[in-house]
């Protein structure tokens, strides 16, 4: 395996993925994941070379994240802003197919600024469950279940 050359995880100063909250995924010879500032990145799994970066999937903020779950030829993505996204990851970039607000974020990220104060960014860091064509998701106030089947809409 390869090791990145950067010693910082700040955006623009990293050459790989500094995955702090969620696990990156491997598809063939490629790695896709969210770094510690919300940047979705695609890497060559053989060399570690960064192929692309997208700021579109979730907020570009400290500890921003998204949970990636494979479903056939695409992925269900739940970002920390409460959106359910259907997407594909390719060697050339991120392809978003659809997005809908599934649940409201209700928890503070507790992120500290460089000056030591708490940044009040409201997030949802709960990984959903999938079963029998449904998604079950929660925040600090509710648990919801929604159908993922097209025939239900």
Specify the residue positions occupied by each region the protein language model found.
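Noncatalytic, solvent-exposed loop/strand surfaces
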Residues: 1-153
